[in-house]
């Protein structure tokens, strides 16, 4: 049964573009990979602020946290503690590389299954961890799950969705990331006062992994992946099922042509880096992920409880503040889901950059003026104002760079280098997330509130990047992206031969 029907944007081939129940179900199930990712992002900051967790694994950090005269900005500065958060993303880089080959050779569906299995085993290992080695080992397996999932899920959704609805359906991945973050912050709040509560928090990661594992048995492989692997008839059958119509020849032929070009490419990475036509999507896709991480968002997502405790909030108050922030994150992502295929990508990205710049600069100014090296901020007004500003900042990210940092790289590459190109985007995400996770607390200790001004300047730079270098991609079939967008862009057309 069709949920809706509309032709794609004028100027592109008029593929029938029904949004069927089959497509919607496949996209929702696949997007649970975002729930896994979000849960992990949200859980680590709360766990690392729990006294029971610090006593079990980082007693020296616990002691430093409770010193009366400890520098406010340096309470949690510890390389091993930061490695607990960041080790996952280091593993994710390697896993994404492997996944790009697995996905091309065996398909998107089995790769998504593997992601859920890695994540499930990692969650069980963390739940039962008795020493730091087990804890880090579990994080590495979680990293493999995240690497496989983040590499494959957005591609899966982009390939299975009609062009007219691709943006909104892909935003579901980011929406479930925000739901995962919100769920994790609430779980941390509930478990923070329990003995060994950190085990329940970390073990909770098994829930989204199980949902994805079971759900992956009910999704279709993408037609593009089937046809790319020589299964033309199966690809045609799946295309009819997910489109809900018999007349799929036009779209099938377009995919078939793209796969014929793709199968001639024996070394996708060599093709990606040596062919001039691939340079525009490579630069834009990779830089979008770089900028997404250097908005400063994971400073808030990883370490929000730590930041609120740094300002003098108690453990419970800091966790409640985090729940509020993450609730705003989820609500704002819904706005993106509703407007992304109407407003377009560029408009949201530029507005988000402006909103985040203003709030980061203001937060930096407030902390510079009011948070001294020793002792909490006096009164409740300043922490409340900072909380409101963080909510405004998070909403700006959630309806722009959050979902679109994943969506745009998944829709701009030609099929022959799509896995390789998207790997570069995911790898950039993992590298930058590792850097933030591993070094932010140390940077906070050294640069203090000036760090927020740094992120504000980065937001200005990325807004200018969108203005001058990123084409609008809404409503354009992936197979036509080069012809309709890159070849006509004033700064990128020189890379295409006539």
UniProtKB/Swiss-Prot annotation:
<feature type="transmembrane region" description="Helical; Name=8">
    <location>
        <begin position="320"/>
        <end position="340"/>
    </location>
</feature>
<dbReference type="InterPro" id="IPR005829">
    <property type="entry name" value="Sugar_transporter_CS"/>
</dbReference>
<dbReference type="InterPro" id="IPR036259">
    <property type="entry name" value="MFS_trans_sf"/>
</dbReference>
<keyword id="KW-0762">Sugar transport</keyword>
<feature type="transmembrane region" description="Helical; Name=1">
    <location>
        <begin position="23"/>
        <end position="43"/>
    </location>
</feature>
<keyword id="KW-0769">Symport</keyword>
<feature type="transmembrane region" description="Helical; Name=4">
    <location>
        <begin position="140"/>
        <end position="160"/>
    </location>
</feature>
<feature type="transmembrane region" description="Helical; Name=3">
    <location>
        <begin position="117"/>
        <end position="137"/>
    </location>
</feature>
<dbReference type="GO" id="GO:0015145">
    <property type="term" value="F:monosaccharide transmembrane transporter activity"/>
</dbReference>
<dbReference type="InterPro" id="IPR044778">
    <property type="entry name" value="MFS_STP/MST-like_plant"/>
</dbReference>
<dbReference type="GO" id="GO:0015749">
    <property type="term" value="P:monosaccharide transmembrane transport"/>
</dbReference>
<feature type="transmembrane region" description="Helical; Name=5">
    <location>
        <begin position="167"/>
        <end position="187"/>
    </location>
</feature>
<dbReference type="InterPro" id="IPR045262">
    <property type="entry name" value="STP/PLT_plant"/>
</dbReference>
<feature type="transmembrane region" description="Helical; Name=2">
    <location>
        <begin position="80"/>
        <end position="100"/>
    </location>
</feature>
<feature type="topological domain" description="Cytoplasmic">
    <location>
        <begin position="471"/>
        <end position="498"/>
    </location>
</feature>
<dbReference type="InterPro" id="IPR005828">
    <property type="entry name" value="MFS_sugar_transport-like"/>
</dbReference>
<feature type="transmembrane region" description="Helical; Name=10">
    <location>
        <begin position="381"/>
        <end position="401"/>
    </location>
</feature>
<dbReference type="GO" id="GO:0015293">
    <property type="term" value="F:symporter activity"/>
</dbReference>
<keyword id="KW-1133">Transmembrane helix</keyword>
<feature type="transmembrane region" description="Helical; Name=6">
    <location>
        <begin position="200"/>
        <end position="220"/>
    </location>
</feature>
<feature type="transmembrane region" description="Helical; Name=7">
    <location>
        <begin position="288"/>
        <end position="308"/>
    </location>
</feature>
<comment type="similarity">
    <text>Belongs to the major facilitator superfamily. Sugar transporter (TC 2.A.1.1) family.</text>
</comment>
<dbReference type="GO" id="GO:0009555">
    <property type="term" value="P:pollen development"/>
</dbReference>
<dbReference type="InterPro" id="IPR003663">
    <property type="entry name" value="Sugar/inositol_transpt"/>
</dbReference>
<keyword id="KW-0813">Transport</keyword>
<feature type="transmembrane region" description="Helical; Name=12">
    <location>
        <begin position="450"/>
        <end position="470"/>
    </location>
</feature>
<keyword id="KW-0812">Transmembrane</keyword>
<dbReference type="Pfam" id="PF00083">
    <property type="entry name" value="Sugar_tr"/>
</dbReference>
<feature type="topological domain" description="Cytoplasmic">
    <location>
        <begin position="1"/>
        <end position="22"/>
    </location>
</feature>
<comment type="function">
    <text>Mediates an active uptake of hexoses, probably by sugar/hydrogen symport. Can transport glucose, 3-O-methylglucose, xylose, mannose, fructose and galactose.</text>
</comment>
<dbReference type="GO" id="GO:0016020">
    <property type="term" value="C:membrane"/>
</dbReference>
<feature type="transmembrane region" description="Helical; Name=11">
    <location>
        <begin position="421"/>
        <end position="441"/>
    </location>
</feature>
<keyword id="KW-0472">Membrane</keyword>
<feature type="transmembrane region" description="Helical; Name=9">
    <location>
        <begin position="348"/>
        <end position="368"/>
    </location>
</feature>
<protein>
    <recommendedName>
        <fullName>Sugar transport protein 2</fullName>
    </recommendedName>
</protein>
<dbReference type="InterPro" id="IPR020846">
    <property type="entry name" value="MFS_dom"/>
</dbReference>
């Amino acid at each position: 049964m069709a949920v809706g029907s509309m032709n794609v944007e004028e100027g592109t081939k008029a593929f029938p573009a029904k949004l069927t129940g089959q497509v919607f179900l496949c996209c929702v199930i696949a997007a649970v990979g975002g729930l896994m990712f979000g849960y992990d992002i949200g859980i680590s900051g709360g766990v690392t602020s729990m006294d029971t967790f610090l006593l079990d694994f980082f007693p020296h950090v616990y002691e430093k946290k409770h010193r009366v005269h400890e520098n406010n900005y340096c309470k949690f500065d510890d390389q091993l503690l930061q490695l607990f958060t960041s080790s996952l993303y280091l593993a994710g880089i390697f896993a994404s590389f492997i996944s790009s080959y697995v996905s091309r050779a065996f398909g998107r569906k089995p790769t998504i299954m593997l992601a859920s299995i890695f994540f499930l085993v990692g969650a069980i290992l963390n739940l039962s961890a008795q020493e730091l080695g087990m804890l880090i080992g579990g994080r590495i397996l979680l990293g493999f799950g995240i690497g496989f999932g983040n590499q494959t899920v957005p591609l899966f959704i982009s390939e299975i969705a009609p062009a007219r609805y691709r943006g909104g359906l892909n935003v579901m991945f980011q929406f479930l990331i925000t739901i995962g973050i919100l769920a994790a912050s609430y779980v941390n709040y509930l478990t923070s006062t329990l003995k060994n509560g950190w085990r329940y928090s970390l073990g909770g990661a098994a829930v989204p992994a199980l949902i994805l594992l079971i759900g992956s048995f009910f999704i279709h492989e993408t037609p593009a992946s089937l046809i790319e692997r020589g299964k033309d008839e199966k690809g045609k059958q799946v295309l009819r099922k997910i489109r809900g119509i018999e007349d799929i020849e036009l779209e099938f032929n377009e995919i078939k042509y793209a796969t014929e070009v793709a199968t001639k490419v024996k070394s996708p990475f060599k093709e990606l880096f040596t062919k001039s036509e691939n340079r525009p999507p490579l630069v834009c896709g990779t830089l979008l992920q770089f900028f997404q991480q250097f908005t400063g968002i994971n400073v808030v997502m990883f370490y929000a409880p730590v930041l609120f405790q740094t300002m003098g909030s108690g453990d419970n108050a800091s966790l409640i503040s985090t729940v509020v922030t993450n609730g705003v994150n989820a609500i704002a992502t819904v706005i993106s889901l509703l407007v992304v295929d109407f407003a377009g990508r560029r408009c949201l990205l530029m507005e988000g950059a402006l909103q985040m710049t203003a709030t980061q600069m203001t937060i930096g100014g407030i902390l510079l003026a009011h948070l001294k090296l020793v002792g909490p901020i006096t009164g409740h007004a300043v922490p409340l104002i900072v909380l409101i500003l963080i909510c405004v900042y998070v909403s700006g990210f959630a309806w722009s760079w959050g979902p679109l940092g994943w969506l745009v790289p998944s829709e701009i590459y030609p099929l022959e280098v799509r896995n390789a190109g998207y790997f570069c985007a995911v790898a950039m995400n993992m590298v930058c997330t590792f850097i933030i996770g591993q070094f932010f607390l140390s940077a906070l200790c050294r640069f203090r509130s000036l760090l927020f001004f740094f992120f504000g300047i980065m937001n200005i730079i990325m807004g200018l990047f969108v203005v001058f270098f990123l084409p609008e991609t809404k409503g354009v079939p992936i197979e036509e992206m080069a012809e309709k967008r890159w070849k006509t862009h004033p700064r990128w057309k020189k890379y295409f031969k006539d």
